Amino acid sequence: MAVTQTAQACDLVIFGAKGDLARRKLLPSLYQLEKAGQLNPDTRIIGVGRADWDKAAYTKVVREALETFMKETIDEGLWDTLSARLDFCNLDVNDTAAFSRLGAMLDQKNRITINYFAMPPSTFGAICKGLGEAKLNAKPARVVMEKPLGTSLATSQEINDQVGEYFEECQVYRIDHYLGKETVLNLLALRFANSLFVNNWDNRTIDHVEITVAEEVGIEGRWGYFDKAGQMRDMIQNHLLQILCMIAMSPPSDLSADSIRDEKVKVLKSLRRIDRSNVREKTVRGQYTAGFAQGKKVPGYLEEEGANKSSNTETFVAIRVDIDNWRWAGVPFYLRTGKRLPTKCSEVVVYFKTPELNLFKESWQDLPQNKLTIRLQPDEGVDIQVLNKVPGLDHKHNLQITKLDLSYSETFNQTHLADAYERLLLETMRGIQALFVRRDEVEEAWKWVDSITEAWAMDNDAPKPYQAGTWGPVASVAMITRDGRSWNEFE
């Protein structure tokens, strides 16, 4: 079936219909797509779960989720349209025969079936088997899966093999929700539509790059999941490496899904290996202790409800990443991410090299670097720090740091920036895979991450403590300071 830019008529089947992901993210995003007129008039939304619900009961659950997790008041006209799309199928995913009930509800002739797995990856194999046995897996049916998939290369391959037994790669949409953020999408335009950056985006002009994804919250009651994953698997493998790829990739031949993803895979294959020989030099792992966050006292990681008091799981990671290719040789990428940090923010800062000759020593003995800051959240936008002459009659060139600032909300008069899930759901309905992660991307990322986590395990060093509400262990500052650089300060 040909791909179009219009959302096709779909049966969107949400496995895990009463779970957190569905209630917090998917349902509010579907409401916003309805509001924007982006849903095909014939699209239906079918919740799947073990609950003994009918259409009316599920409709009530959806309404409650929207009232709880949306910041705006529900428009009753929109609600009437959205609620008319809803239905529910009572189904245990481990009961393969029960999938025939789902099949009876679907309209495979006139609608594309999109199976959204809003459930743990351990269930994906059973779901795919049920769909396959019920003959619900033929093209153009699609499956949507949340990253991270597995906790290592081996477990990721196992999950992908289970899915691949019933669905071809062109049917599989692996979500990394950071790829749906407007500011991440803008990286392609910023880099490849502007000659200012197209011609100045390599080791000739760039000194280093910093990528920070900071969270104010702790583990939010997710001890069971997080303690097995840790910040490395949960955030570095899952989100920060994708951002790094978008910053470091070479220009694709076009904007097709495979052209973009081919270039990202090249970056991942060029990442210099970190193993036991250099892991202490290149990485810092930390774990938050009791402190103050969001204006209140909070417990340390080992004091959280359900905690294993001897856990060595990291809640903070800082890494120096080197890319061994012609474009980036000699340009370090510094990544850091953690929980219980002072603020919630995600940003990329690109530092440009200073001029070879300083003509303004009377004003600045050492010229500061120009830097491009890409604010992914909050206050989405881009700013460039430059030096300008201070106006005046003084014969000296008094220079001052100023910023050229593009704020998305102000520049584009946007009161509502589409949530990442709105974009990704819509792209799934359109059949466009450019914002989704291909299997080889996932596996190359896991290869690189596995060598680090294996080195940590062999060293058996405890993560370095940092107080909740601070910017991580002192060692993370020392790591970048050794290179004569410093982390960007948040305003």
UniProtKB/Swiss-Prot annotation:
Keywords: Carbohydrate metabolism, Glucose metabolism, NADP, Oxidoreductase, Quorum sensing. NADP(+) binds at residues 50, 92-93, 147. Disruption phenotype: Loss of production of extracellular death factor. Pathway: Carbohydrate degradation; pentose phosphate pathway; D-ribulose 5-phosphate from D-glucose 6-phosphate (oxidative stage): step 1/3. One of its GO terms (cellular component) is cytosol. GO terms for molecular function: glucose-6-phosphate dehydrogenase activity; identical protein binding; NADP binding. It is an enzyme of class 1 (oxidoreductase). GO terms for biological process: glucose metabolic process; pentose-phosphate shunt; pentose-phosphate shunt, oxidative branch; quorum sensing. The active site is at residue 239. It catalyses: D-glucose 6-phosphate + NADP(+) = 6-phospho-D-glucono-1,5-lactone + NADPH + H(+). Its EC number is 1.1.1.49. Probably processed by the ClpPX protease to generate the extracellular death factor (EDF). It is thought that processing produces Asn-Asn-Trp-Asp-Asn which is amidated to generate Asn-Asn-Trp-Asn-Asn. Substrate binds at residues 177, 181, 215, 234, 339, 344. HAMAP family: G6PD. Catalyzes the oxidation of glucose 6-phosphate to 6-phosphogluconolactone. EDF binds to MazF; mutated EDF (sequence NNGNN) does not. In pull-down experiments interacts with CedA. Belongs to the glucose-6-phosphate dehydrogenase family. This is Glucose-6-phosphate 1-dehydrogenase. The gene is zwf.
